[in-house]
Swiss-Prot record:
Highest taxon listed in the record's lineage: Viruses
Organism: Passionfruit woodiness virus (strain Severe) (PWV)
GO cellular component, one term: viral capsid
Protein family according to the UniProt entry: Belongs to the potyviridae genome polyprotein family.
PTM info: Genome polyprotein of potyviruses undergoes post-translational proteolytic processing by the main proteinase NIa-pro resulting in the production of at least ten individual proteins. The P1 proteinase and the HC-pro cleave only their respective C-termini autocatalytically. 6K1 is essential for proper proteolytic separation of P3 from CI.
Cross-referenced InterPro entries: Poty_coat
Keyword Repressor: no
Signal among keywords: no
Basic and acidic residues bias (residue ranges): 9-36
Taxonomic placement: Viruses, Riboviria, Orthornavirae, Pisuviricota, Stelpaviricetes
Protein name per UniProt: Genome polyprotein
Keyword annotations: Capsid protein, Virion
Region (Disordered): 1-45
Amino acid sequence: KDEIIDAEADAKKVVSKKDTQDAGEVNKGKEKDKDVNAGSKGSGVPRLQKITKKMNLPMVKGNMVLDLDHLIEYKPDQTKLFNTRATDAQFATWYEGVKAEYELSDDQMGVIMNPFMVWCIENGTSPDINGVWVMMDGDEQVEYPLKPMVENAKPTLRQIMHHFSDAAEAYIEMRCASGPYMPRYGLLRNLRDKNLARYAFDFYEVNAKTSDRAREAVAQMKAAALSNVTNKLFGLDGNVATISEDTERHTARDVNQNMHTLLGMGAPQ
C-alpha cells in the first residue's frame, strides 16, 4: 500500500514538472514573439530602392535593356575588370607556357615564381628587358633565361605581374619589418619616405584601398620613369631602294658635289 502511494506521488511530481516546463516554453515564446496591439499607431520607415525604373535608363523600342534585379546583385571584384591586368585565361596560358619551356613541374614552378617576383620588384617589368634573370640559392647565383617569361606574356609582362601585386606588397612589408629595405625602383626614383616602400615597384596595382598619399607617390614615380621615353610609331624603313639614276657630271673644279660654280667665283681657299 505504501508503495502504491509513493508511485502516485512520483507520477504527480513528473506531471507537475512537465507542466512547468511547458509553461516556461510558452513564456519564452511569448517573449520572443511580441504581440502588436492592433489599436496602436505608428509610421513605418520607407525603404528606397537604389535603382528604380523611374531613372533615365537605356531603352530600345520602349524596352529597357538592363536587368535591374541582376544589376543590383552584380558586385564583382573590381581588379578583375581592370584592362591593365591580364585575364585569368591569359595568366594561365603564360604559366603553362613558361612551365613547358623550362620543363618544370608545378611544385618546381612554385619555387621559381617566388624569386622571379622578387627579381621583378627590383628590376621592373619593362618590355625591353632581355638576357637572364637571377635567383639566389644560398650564396650562389642561379641564372634563368628571360625569353620564356617575356615571350609568353600576353598582352605584356607588366599586365601578367599585376596578379602578383598583393603578394609583392606583403613581401616588401615583411622585409621592412626585419630591417631597412627599399626596392631598387624606389631608390632610382629617390623615394625618401620608407613608409611608402611597399608601393615602390612598377607592377603595383592601384585600387580603391590605396591611400591618397600612396596614389600620388605611385603616379609621381611612374611619371619620373617615363619622362624621357619617346615612342615612335614608325621606325626607319629598311626596304628602300634607289629608283632614279643620278646623271649629274662633276669635275674637280666644282665647288661641291651639288654645285658646279659660284657664278664665276672660285672655291674658297
